[in-house]
């Protein structure tokens, strides 16, 4: 079922990389031995966003736990490291002068964080069209116009409006995974510096995250709105005759070798 819905998303949205199925795991022994692990197969620790990039670009199924990840911000979001006074102080030292003008400003972000408080031990990340897991979250890296179509599709069935938050940082892990899980609502994610520097996200990319249990709603709406005429690629209106600014038109006609003049005369003479 999820494979079919993944193919529908690829058909109607045409993302440049695979939509991702992300499954949370309670225990490490739930991970099959043949799934790739950064610590086992790559012989290193890395950032979570790097694994999103490898899965969506290479088509790999990747499993991670805290043993695989050395991103302190991600470890705090997933609850793999406790939030202590020392952790808070480190985050403030990191932010002040970079993301915030002072400690007081930096600390305001904590009021808006969604943390998973060690609710699970890891993630399995797999391309949706060939997913080996039932997703808790589906992540689609896309262009803004593609995100528009995903939003239209979801709201076709649900109505109302989607509400998003953004801090310009901690995008895929915080808003893409944690907030989507805790609110059970789709999120439009402005990917931050981590996603772009280490996670390989392009300048043009954003991300749309959908709870796995609501993927059917999204796909139903995509199909219906596509049939009604809302499409991607956007069918730009082309049924018009081009022209020039008045000050440029005379010179343009000369440079066109008479083509524009003859064309106009053709229609005038019937």
What residue spans do the PLM features occupy?
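Acidic, serine/proline-rich low-complexity intrinsically disordered regions
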Residues: 3-270
């Amino acid at each position: 079922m999820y494979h079919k819905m993944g193919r529908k998303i690829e058909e109607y949205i045409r993302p440049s990389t695979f939509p991702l199925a992300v499954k949370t795991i309670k225990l490490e022994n739930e991970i099959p031995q043949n799934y790739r692990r950064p610590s086992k197969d790559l012989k290193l620790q890395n950032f979570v966003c790097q694994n999103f990039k490898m899965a969506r670009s290479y088509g790999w199924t990747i499993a991670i736990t805290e043993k695989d990840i050395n991103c302190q911000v991600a470890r705090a979001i997933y609850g793999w490291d406790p939030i202590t006074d020392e952790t808070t102080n480190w985050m403030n030292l990191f932010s002040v002068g970079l993301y915030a003008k002072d400690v007081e400003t930096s600390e305001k972000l904590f009021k808006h964080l969604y943390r998973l408080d060690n609710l699970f031990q890891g993630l399995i990340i797999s391309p949706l069209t060939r997913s080996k897991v039932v997703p808790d979250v589906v992540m689609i890296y896309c262009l803004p116009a593609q995100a528009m179509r995903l939003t239209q599709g979801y709201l076709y069935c649900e109505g109302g409006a989607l509400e998003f938050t953004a801090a310009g940082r901690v995008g895929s892990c915080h808003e893409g995974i944690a907030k989507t899980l805790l609110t059970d609502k789709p999120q439009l994610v402005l990917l931050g510096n981590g996603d772009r520097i280490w996670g390989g996200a392009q300048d043009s990319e954003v991300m749309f995250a959908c709870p796995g249990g609501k993927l059917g709603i999204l796909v139903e709406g995509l199909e219906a709105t596509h049939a009604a005429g809302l499409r991607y690629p956007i069918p730009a209106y082309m049924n018009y005759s081009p022209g020039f600014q008045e000050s440029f038109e005379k010179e343009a006609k000369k440079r066109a070798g008479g083509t524009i003049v003859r064309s106009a005369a053709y229609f005038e003479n019937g």
